Amino acid sequence: MLLSSPTTPSRGRTPSAVERLEADKAKYVKTHQVIVRRQEPALRGGPGPLTPHPCNELGASASPRTPGPARRGSGRRQPRPDSLIFYRQKRDCKASVNKENAKGQGLVRRLFLGATRDAAPSSPAPTERPGAPAGWAGSPDTPEATGKRAVCPTCSLPLSEKERFFNYCGLERALVEVLGAERFSPQSWGAEHGPQVATSPPPGSGDTSDWTSSDRDAGSPDCAGGGGGSEAAGSARDGRPTVSVVERNARVIQWLYGCQRARAPPRESEV
């Protein structure tokens, strides 16, 4: 009995795809060396049984079976990980990340605590603050007094860059020195510090009646008298409303902006 080779197609079966590609290689390969060369399969499958089983009740044909396709992996299929394994992996990953973050936060906390401990002995002992002025005094139960107590500690702190920027109306230090730094101090614009403040209006402001009337009121003896100063000042202004802080600051900023524009070189019109 002649046994046919598994690589050569038999007459009773159809050729496989590999055999058909091998037969038609000359159609899609241009190099002669590649046409002549024959590529061996990476994994060669074992030959199947050539004769039917004697106990086969279905009466299979006597033709030999075709060899099964070559399998690149092992016969046993790897189990697919289920959702529980994915959940455990994510949980372990999150736990490790949380541990690393906790270590980093603990290190930063120790560094800051160490810095504060080192700075605590070197810093001088806190001195007792003087008593609050009468303007801040009030009953502790009122919400207004609570808000004032929250704002009051910031008054004793040194000026930051932002506060210095707003006090100097955003001007450069050189321009402030030219105009005079004493003009930007809060004491120079407060009406409660005495009759020497606000003696002349800013040059950039157009209406000078409010400024002159306030100067006359500040220099009047009724204002210096004490108790009825505010009522006398209001009556001396002939019923005119007082200049608000916002309007006064707007006039000061307008005047400073005019000074800055006058100092800058004139620009040529591009129109």
Curated annotation (Swiss-Prot):
<feature type="region of interest" description="Disordered">
    <location>
        <begin position="1"/>
        <end position="84"/>
    </location>
</feature>
<comment type="similarity">
    <text>Belongs to the FAM110 family.</text>
</comment>
<dbReference type="InterPro" id="IPR025740">
    <property type="entry name" value="FAM110"/>
</dbReference>
<feature type="compositionally biased region" description="Polar residues">
    <location>
        <begin position="1"/>
        <end position="13"/>
    </location>
</feature>
<feature type="region of interest" description="Disordered">
    <location>
        <begin position="186"/>
        <end position="242"/>
    </location>
</feature>
<dbReference type="InterPro" id="IPR025739">
    <property type="entry name" value="FAM110_N"/>
</dbReference>
<dbReference type="InterPro" id="IPR025741">
    <property type="entry name" value="FAM110_C"/>
</dbReference>
<dbReference type="Pfam" id="PF14160">
    <property type="entry name" value="FAM110_C"/>
</dbReference>
<dbReference type="Pfam" id="PF14161">
    <property type="entry name" value="FAM110_N"/>
</dbReference>
<protein>
    <recommendedName>
        <fullName>Protein FAM110D</fullName>
    </recommendedName>
</protein>
<feature type="region of interest" description="Disordered">
    <location>
        <begin position="118"/>
        <end position="149"/>
    </location>
</feature>
